[in-house]
UniProtKB/Swiss-Prot annotation:
Keywords: Cytoplasmic vesicle, Glycoprotein, Secreted, Signal. Is implicated in sperm-oocyte interaction during fertilization. This is Zona pellucida-binding protein 2. GO terms for cellular component: acrosomal vesicle; cell body; extracellular region; membrane; nucleus; zona pellucida receptor complex.
Length: 338
C-alpha cells in the first residue's frame, strides 16, 4: 500500500513540475407455527433450506390431538407429497430443500383431528387451515460510489487528464486481485474560493467501485450463489481505497516538510456511498416486504426485473415468481457478463 501511495506522490510532483434472523427470516433450525387468518410472510434465502413449517398453531401444539391428518397444498394449488426436495413428516411438518424462485408462493396446510367426549365417546371432526406465504430472497450486490478532490495548478492543461488516467490505473491495481474494478470514472475542474487561502483550482473526481471485473466468476470457486464472495471482496476493495487516500494525506503532511505540490489530495474530501443492486428476477419493496426491507426478494407474479435495478416492474402477463422478462420486452443485463 505505502509503495503505491509513494508512486502516486511521485506522479503528482512530476505532473506539477514539483458487514440473526429477522421476524420472518429463519436459519435451517427455524420453526414456524401456523396462524389462522392473514398468513405470515416467510423469507428463504436462495439455495438454502426453508424453516420448518408446522401445521398447527402454537397453542394447539401444547394439547393432545386425536387422529390428526395433514394435507399440504403448495404454490399453483398442487398437493404436496414428500420427495427429494419436499420433506413432510408424519406430524405434518414441512421443509423445502434448496429453495428456488419457482417454489415461492402460498403454502396451505389443512389439519383435521377429532375431539372425543369422555362420557359418551362422541366424536367430532375439527378442521383448521394455516397459510404461509413463502418468498425466495437473496442478498443485494454491493458496489460503492466514491468521490474525492485534488488540487491542481490550473483547469487548463493536459496534465489533469494524465493524472486522472494514472489515478484510475493505480486504484484498479489496488483491487484487481479481488476481481473488483473502477467503473464510470469522471472528473470536472472547478475554481474554489477558500477563506484565507483565496481562489484555488480543484479536480472533483467521481467513480464507482464494482465487484464484477472481467473473470469475476472465477473467484466464486464453483459456488451456485456468489453474493457472499463478491460482497466480501467489495468490502475489502472499499477498505483498501479508503486506506490509500488516508495514506495520501499522511504522506504529504509528514514526508514533504509541509510543502505540498500544486496537485495533491484534499484531506477529508473522500465520500463513500454504498449502492445496492439486485440480480434479475429480484427486487426491493419496503412496503410489501417490510420484514425483509434490505433483501432482494423474488419478483411476484405480474412483475419482472430484467436487469440489476432494485425495482420489480409491472407486467400483467407474467404468471410466475422470479420473472426476468416480460413478453415483447427484451432487456439484457450486461453487468454480469464474464
Amino acid at each position: 500500500m505505502m509503495r503505491t501511495c509513494v508512486l502516486l506522490s511521485a506522479v503528482l510532483w512530476c505532473l506539477t513540475g514539483v458487514q440473526c434472523p429477522r421476524f420472518t427470516l429463519f436459519n435451517k433450525k427455524g420453526f414456524i407455527y401456523g396462524k389462522t387468518g392473514q398468513p405470515d410472510k416467510i423469507y428463504v434465502e436462495l439455495h438454502q433450506n426453508s424453516p420448518v413449517l408446522i401445521c398447527m398453531d402454537f397453542k394447539l401444539s401444547k394439547k393432545e390431538i386425536v387422529d390428526p391428518t395433514y394435507l399440504w397444498i403448495g404454490p399453483n394449488e398442487k398437493t404436496l407429497t414428500g420427495n427429494n426436495r419436499i420433506n413432510i413428516t408424519e406430524t405434518g411438518q414441512l421443509m423445502v430443500k434448496d429453495f428456488l424462485e419457482p417454489l415461492s408462493g402460498l403454502y396451505t396446510c389443512t389439519l383435521s383431528y377429532k375431539t372425543v367426549k369422555a362420557e359418551t365417546q362422541e366424536e367430532k371432526t375439527v378442521k383448521k387451515r394455516y397459510d404461509f406465504m413463502v418468498f425466495a430472497y437473496r442478498e443485494p450486490d454491493y458496489s460503492y460510489q466514491m468521490a474525492v478532490r485534488f488540487t491542481t495548478r490550473s483547469c487548463i492543461g493536459r496534465y489533469n487528464d494524465v493524472f486522472f488516467r494514472v489515478l484510475k490505473k493505480i486504484l484498479d491495481s489496488l483491487i484487481s486481485d479481488l476481481s473488483c474494478h473502477v467503473i464510470e470514472p469522471s472528473y470536472k475542474c472547478h475554481s474554489v474560493e477558500i477563506p484565507e487561502h483565496g481562489l484555488i483550482h480543484e479536480l472533483f473526481i467521481a467513480f464507482q467501485v464494482n465487484p464484477f471485473a472481467p473473470g469475476w466468476k472465477g473467484a466464486c470457486n464453483g459456488s451456485v450463489d456468489c453474493e457472499d464472495t463478491t460482497n466480501h471482496n467489495i468490502l475489502q476493495a472499499r477498505d483498501r481505497i479508503e486506506d490509500f487516500f488516508r495514506s495520501q494525506a499522511y504522506i504529504f503532511y509528514h514526508n514533504f516538510n509541509k510543502t505540498l505540490p500544486a496537485m495533491h489530495f484534499v484531506d477529508h474530501s473522500l465520500q463513500v456511498v454504498r449502492l445496492d443492486s439486485c440480480r434479475p428476477g429480484f427486487g426491493k419493496n419496503e412496503r410489501l416486504h417490510s420484514n425483509c426491507a434490505s433483501c432482494c426478494v423474488v419478483c411476484s407474479p405480474a412483475t419482472f426485473s430484467p436487469d440489476v435495478n432494485v425495482t420489480c416492474q409491472t407486467c400483467v402477463s407474467v404468471l410466475t415468481y422470479g420473472a426476468k422478462s416480460c413478453p415483447q420486452t427484451s432487456n439484457k443485463n450486461q453487468q454480469y457478463e464474464d
